[in-house]
Amino acid sequence: MNWIGLSLFAAVLSVEALAASPLEDPEFATRDSRNWVVMVTQPTCSFCTRLENEILQPLRASGQFEHQVRFTTVDIGAASPLVDFDGSSTTTIQFADRYQGFGTPTLLFLSPEGDVLAPPKFGVP
């Protein structure tokens, strides 16, 4: 393998490592000045996997939004416990319903306080 090929291979590996970095936990009550992008998902959603792999992972890997946006997921495959923005207990399903995250994938754009910043985006663009 020549040096150019080796360099490209190393670059791809480093981008893949960054892209595969985990999402932040949905700790909505934790104060932070960054807005949230929340993907409403469920385990059997192939379009969720596509959205994550083709759009969200590259956005996180770019580092361009690191100081502006927190990315997370809310799984509505089961009503799992979740701490809401005000510190109260809710479930993932109740949380998603409140923000009109009825189907998967749905992207929610929320302020650090839980206010809606833009209408939900349904499906894969």
Locate the predicted segments by residue.
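Bacterial N-terminal signal peptides
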Residues: 5-16
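A short beta-strand-turn-helix
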Residues: 20-35
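Short active-site neighborhood of thiol/selenol oxidoreductases, capturing the structured segment around
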Residues: 31-45
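Loop/turn elements at helix/coil->beta-strand transitions in domains of secreted/extracellular proteins
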Residues: 33-36, 67-70, 103-104, 112
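Solvent-exposed loop/turn segments at secondary-structure junctions
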Residues: 43-47, 76-81, 114-116, 124
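Typically the conserved alpha-helix immediately C-terminal to a functionally engaged Cys/Sec
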Residues: 49-64
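Thiol-based oxidoreductase modules, predominantly thioredoxin-like and allied folds used
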Residues: 64-90
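Non-catalytic, surface beta->alpha helical segment in thiol-disulfide oxidoreductase systems
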Residues: 98, 102-125
